[in-house]
Amino acid sequence: MPAGATSVRGDLADPDTLPPALEGVEAIVHLAALFRTEDEDAIWRANRDGTRNLIAAAEAHAPAARFVMASTGNVYDDDQVRPSREGDRCTPTAAYPASKLVAEESLRGSGLNWSILRLPFVYGDGDGHLAMIPRMAPRFGLHPAHTYSVAHHRDVMTAVEIALSGAMDGRIVNIADDRPVTVYEMAELAGDPLEGSAEPLTDPWSGRMDPSLAHQLGFRPTVPTIYDAAREGIL
């Protein structure tokens, strides 16, 4: 733990455990989420109900706190005609993005001072996300040439720090680095290359996000591309 920090254990599913973590705080950063499971009910309980519990506790015990919530770029519809912008249509059907979108709506409808960061594919520091790509691509039919917006862990922190400054108050903001990357490239970087394909892409803009608003608000990635991360040894 950093010097001066105090750890308080809580459970988003148990509202009674939340007040001790919130009393007197000036800011709340909500990064908790559940998605690596086939239990859709558990996803909804964690992401929708858990967020609502945290919002209610914040309204009661830290109503003046700045509330920064991590969401996902997966909320956008797949059939975009360009990289997704914050005002674009969002009608997700899968449990994870749908539950995150409802959580966003709950926060936006609260009386709190909020900001929402829609994150792309996040990787870095050996978190295992890149290593999953060679296995997940065939399972989910990901085209090797499909490109995704990405961001390193460091730049999630960069975005959170900017949000905590107040620059993103009352906004939903896409976060992404400077260069989208293909599934093929991610598998190569993971050390387990995929077969290529000349089949046409469907929904080629799915997974791509436009970070222009973030740039206007002061965000610049400290890890500009996934290849910079590879050179630094921080994949």
Model-derived features: positions:
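Conserved Rossmann-fold NAD(P)-dependent oxidoreductase catalytic core, especially the SDR/UDP-sugar
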Residues: 52-95
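Mid/C-terminal beta-alpha module of Rossmann-like enzyme folds, strongest
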Residues: 159-206, 210-211
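NAD(P)H-binding glycine-rich loop region in Rossmannoid oxidoreductase-like domains
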Residues: 9-49, 75
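C-terminal amphipathic/interface module of NAD(P)-dependent oxidoreductases
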Residues: 194-235
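Active-site Tyr-X1-5-Lys
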Residues: 78, 91-115
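Glycine-rich NAD(P)-binding loop of the Rossmann-fold in SDR/ketoreductase-type enzymes
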Residues: 13, 42-53, 90, 94, ...
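NAD(P)-dependent short-chain dehydrogenase/reductase
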Residues: 108-153
